[in-house]
A protein has these predicted regions:
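Beta-strand signatures of extracellular beta-sandwich domains
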Residues: 37-39
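Core domains of carbohydrate- and sulfate-ester-processing enzymes
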Residues: 77-113, 201, 219-226, 231-233, ...
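Residues at the C-termini of beta-strands that transition into short coil/loop
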Residues: 42, 182, 308
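Substrate-binding/active-site clefts of carbohydrate-active enzymes
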Residues: 92, 113-120, 129-298, 303, ...
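Short proline/glycine-enriched turn/loop motifs at strand-loop junctions of beta-rich domains
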Residues: 29-35, 68
């Protein structure tokens, strides 16, 4: 299937949709289940159970006026375990508890609809962990620091992953509910208000997203969709790989990309460790993500950035090339060779920059990074048992 056909197909939306007549539509993709009940929480803490309609390809759905904006709900799998919505927009408590019906149109963006962003060459990024950047560890408390960023000459802040994770403390890389900001940090409205206020001060806001694995606790996709959502052909450092050869799995992540960019007005995304995204499809999921984002959002600047330790240059912008591309990627070579140069460390992946092992001084690799982008452009990597690593980066734009 070609990319053009992928972009025009009809697909199902994950999660809840508020219908014009006030009813709520609930969709759940649960190919491992035989029967699903929607469980709506009542004032007395009990649940009203409504059997969902079975549809093709493992989908279950129901339209009902028994739920409203703010209602808490869960899904009961085969008359047994109750799970949150994998596409929950907000959790009542933690990842094991009920999801909340959210009105995506409720927030007043005011003049932010006129925000066009900033070009990539103006990006001066400041990375933030929401939980540790301030004493309060919230979206609201970051908002109070925006003038500080402006005074430094910062033009963009990048939030480390905020997708809902178990407990109250996490770096963000164990998220399991990818559409729900962790409620330890604040509500969806408070995150949107942070972004709106940042834009008023001329600051872009980026989000770090993790599409290579789910955290080990609270990942209820293992209950409802394990046979289709994950696959054992490829193994990642964090367990079974995500099955990006499945059409609905691809849709889940593409919808998540557009969700953050469109509903939250983020200016860009940083895709974590894409070298651990395994996809043998004719069109790689990374290509489809960037093509769909460019097709869908044309009225403002959006920027998509990769972390890719494999040094694959084909996803990045080339000189005199107008195809869909990612603006840039984190240069792990630069970090590693500078670290080796300063500390002399030569264990793990630092051995690839060690003079003792490579017969080249770390400064050689640093100079190559500064001149050409990647230090490794197909040379054998000692850390990877002398398997070649990287692609030619000489024809990338300077800003990549």
């Amino acid at each position: 299937m070609g990319l053009a056909k992928l972009l025009t197909r009809v697909k199902k939306n994950f999660g809840t949709t508020i219908l014009p007549d006030g009813q709520i539509n609930f969709n759940l993709w649960a190919p491992d289940a035989k029967e699903i009940a929607l469980c709506i929480k009542k004032p007395n803490e009990s649940f009203l159970e409504l059997k969902m309609e079975t549809e093709k390809d493992g989908w279950f759905s129901i339209k009902t006026d028994k739920a409203k904006i703010g209602s808490e709900y869960m899904f009961k799998i085969d008359n047994g375990l109750m799970i949150p919505d994998p596409a929950s927009r907000q959790q009542a408590k933690d990842v094991h508890n009920a999801s909340i019906v959210v009105d995506s149109n409720e927030f007043n963006w005011e003049n932010d609809i006129n925000w066009k962003g900033r070009p990539w060459h103006e990006a001066v990024l400041y990375e933030i962990h929401t939980g540790t950047f301030t004493k309060e560890g919230t979206f609201n408390s970051i908002k109070e620091k925006l003038d500080y960023f402006v005074s430094l000459g910062i033009t963009a802040i990048e939030l480390m992953p905020v997708a809902d994770f178990p407990g109250k403390r996490n770096w963000g890389y164990d998220g399991v509910l990818l559409f729900a900001p962790d409620n330890t940090y604040g509500t969806p409205e408070e995150l949107k208000d942070l972004i709106k206020t940042a834009h008023e001060k001329g600051l872009m806001v980026f989000l770090d997203v993790v599409y290579n694995h789910f955290g080990p606790e609270g990942n209820y996709l293992y209950v409802s969709a394990k046979s289709k959502f994950f696959e054992s052909k490829h193994i990642t450092p964090w367990g079974d790989a995500i099955n990006f050869e499945n059409r609905y799995v691809r849709d889940f992540f593409i919808q998540n990309v557009l969700f953050w960019l469109e509903e939250y007005h983020f200016d860009g995304l940083r895709l974590d460790a894409v070298h651990a995204i395994k996809d043998d499809s004719p069109v790689h999921i990374l290509e489809e993500i960037v093509a769909k984002a460019r097709e869908q959002i044309k009225d403002r600047n959006i920027h998509l950035v990769l972390e890719n330790d494999d040094n694959i240059s084909k996803f990045l912008k080339k000189e005199n090339n107008n195809h869909d591309y990612y603006e840039a990627q984190w240069n792990d070579d630069f970090h590693h060779c500078v670290h080796s140069l300063i500390t002399g460390e030569k264990t793990g992946y630092y051995q690839d920059y060690s003079e003792e092992i490579t017969s080249k001084n770390p400064a050689y690799f640093l100079a190559k990074c500064l001149a050409e982008g990647f230090a490794y452009q197909g040379e054998p990597s000692a850390y990877r048992s002398n398997v070649p690593r990287g692609e030619n980066s000489k024809n990338l734009t300077v800003s990549s």
